[in-house]
Amino acid sequence: MGLCFPCPGESAPPTPDLEEKRAKLAEAAERRQKEAASRGILDVQSVQEKRKKKEKIEKQIATSGPPPEGGLRWTVS
């Protein structure tokens, strides 16, 4: 008949250290995030450059302060 338990001479398979396991899980999570971020995008670098350029422009607008008075004029003819 079959046995439900391994032979007593065999030792349990070694389990990975907790730190190693966490590192592998972190690597896998980062890889999945990168793949998800680039899904459906043909040229990833151009998208990243556009995003950085947009953030730079927004930062310049935020640091420039409020626009000076009289910037726009409304004329009715």
Curated annotation (Swiss-Prot):
One GO cellular component, as annotated: secretory granule membrane
Coarse class of the protein's main subcellular location: membrane
Gene Ontology molecular-function annotations: ATPase binding
Annotated lipid attachment (N-myristoyl glycine): 2
Biological process according to GO: negative regulation of ERAD pathway; negative regulation of protein-containing complex assembly; negative regulation of retrograde protein transport, ER to cytosol; negative regulation of VCP-NPL4-UFD1 AAA ATPase complex assembly; positive regulation of autophagy; positive regulation of protein lipidation
Bias kind Basic and acidic residues: ranges: 25-37
InterPro entries hit by this protein: SVIP, SVIP_metazoa
Region entry Disordered, spans: 1-20, 25-77
Phosphoserine PTM positions: 46
Keywords tagged on the record: Cell membrane, Endoplasmic reticulum, Golgi apparatus, Lipoprotein, Lysosome, Membrane, Myristate, Palmitate, Phosphoprotein
Localization annotation: Membrane; Smooth endoplasmic reticulum membrane; Golgi apparatus membrane; Cell membrane
Statement: the UniProt record of this protein carries the keyword Ribosomal protein: no
Chain positions covered by the region annotation VCP/p97-interacting motif (VIM): 21-33
Lipidation positions, renumbered (S-palmitoyl cysteine): 4, 7
Entry membrane topology: Lipid-anchor; Peripheral membrane protein
Subunit structure, as described in the record: Interacts (via VIM motif) with VCP/p97. Forms a complex with VCP/p97 and DERL1.
Protein role: Negative regulator of the ER-associated degradation pathway (ERAD) of misfolded proteins. It competes with AMFR/gp78 for binding VCP/p97, and inhibits AMFR/gp78-VCP/p97 complex formation that is required for degradation of ERAD substrates. Involved in the regulation of adrenal cortisol and dehydroepiandrosterone (DHEA) biosynthesis.
PANTHER family, per database record: SMALL VCP/P97-INTERACTING PROTEIN, SMALL VCP_P97-INTERACTING PROTEIN
Family: Belongs to the SVIP family.
The protein, known as: Small VCP/p97-interacting protein
Species, as recorded: Homo sapiens (Human)
Source lineage: Eukaryota, Metazoa, Chordata, Craniata, Vertebrata
